[in-house]
Amino acid sequence: VGNLKVMMFADSFHPHTDGAVIAMDRQAEGLERRGHEVVVVAPDAPGRKPYPRRVHYLPSVGFKTYAGYRIVHTPGDVMEFVRKEKPDILHCHGLASMAILSLTAARTTKIPHLITFHTMANEAVKYYSPLPIRDDMIVPMVWLYLRGMLKRTEVVIAPSKPIKDELEANGVCMNACEVVPTGVDTNVYSPDNHDKDFLKRFGLDGKPVALHVGRLSHEKRLDIVLGAMKDLARDEPDLHLLVVGKGPAEGHYKRLASDLGVSDRVVFAGFLPDGDLATAYASCDMLVIASTFETQGLVVLEALASGMPVAGIRFRAIPEFVHEGVNGCLFDEESCAEAVRRCLARSDSMRINALATAREYSVDACTEKLERAYALAAEVLARTH
């Protein structure tokens, strides 16, 4: 692949951060390291900060049921911008208004187009639909929309194989589907970031600490982890849980911790900047993730790269990266506490294996896969038009 100009379209963008925003940033950095140019088309938002690459902002409005998310309400001058920039690739990181906009631009200009399937939209709609429609009615409508959308792009990128399988199982016909995980930067996330003073900030020095990282929303299912902390009170009385992240369900989870009688062993740290987050991974004993919403679970790879065993739910993308008894333990809803026990008991060997897993998903290795997906998109376009 020669040097490309890639135009990325983002439904979700800074100052809001979620998995899709982080994935897009990492992929853009990986491409730039390899000599490609990346420009971004994104919804404008209050409080925007400087960004390390050119961004073309479009007028947008806030999405009332999902704080921080914005919907582009007019196409603005996006067609003029695409024609002026003459990108080689249009890559959309979203399934809503930007997917429609970027597909329209791709069809008009005959530029190869890809969509990364970052979000299980069929499940997100249960939590965030602005319409008072029952799940059994709205979920089929979402799949209908997704089938129509994803068959029109040259390549669908799935962040993990289970997501590709799930799309195919739900009757999504795609020109091509490539599995391209988002890479983890092992220079940023590393056991070298261990800092014995970090846990002192939270009064946790000298204690075993499990870490939970993610937006505090209902679909992340922190309630399962809090329930496990109650179960672990008897045989792991010193174990504490450090919860990193903010979100709309924060108050709910704090009340639940209190109701379960585990408030004294759970610390809500709020949002941590990247440097502190890397230190948190390297300084705690293990990561726990109970979300069934993950298309990849970026936090899992960040933890593994930091030499941290992971207790993860046996669902969707998580078992792709967490291997039972090797670099962590898998659990079902009712067996989270037992998985935490197993990780704590065998953490030394799991730490070594965690690092080996992370190396397979380096930014460079994943960027090569992305380049191959771009080449495939050009082939598909040439073949079908």
Model-derived regions: residue spans:
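A short, well-ordered alpha-helix in the C-terminal region of glycosyltransferases
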Residues: 348-361, 372
